[in-house]
Amino acid sequence: MANEREQNHPTIYLFTDGASSGNPGPGGYGIVLKCAGIEKEISGGFSLTTNNRMELMAVIIGLEAIKWKNARVEVYSDSSYVVKALNEDWLATWERRGFTKVKNVDLWTRFIPLYRSHNVTFHWIKGHAGHPENERCDALAVAAGAGAIKNGIALPEDSGYKEEQNKIL
């Protein structure tokens, strides 16, 4: 019965963007969640990270913000990296191969159970093309990353990025 009720929730629209000033550099993510006339914005940043990490982090944080199980979620992202990983089955291949030679494994393994707990569809949208939610997510991401640094706000370390770099060195 509870599962029936959960499936009757309205669709959640998740708009995401990630940014870094330099690649790597200070970076941030921006999220706009919309559902049944309600809108929520989320953002955060790190002192040293990459744009791809922030693009994926935006989706992860957005999915973590959803409290329903089995929610219908439409994700809109300008990240080919994230969208193609799902829509072109890159993620399934990476997982099958044990994530050998794959970057951002810490984030992908955090993403997988979130993705599987909902009914998620990914849509690629062109960035910086006047899409209002994408433009807002971009502004949130830039403000949370490079903008915070410019304003003297100390950002946390992206420990996953640091660990990945230590493996390479």
Spans of features found by a protein language model:
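RNase H-like nuclease fold core
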Residues: 2-53, 57, 63-71, 147-157, ...
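N-terminal hydrophobic targeting segments
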Residues: 1-2, 128
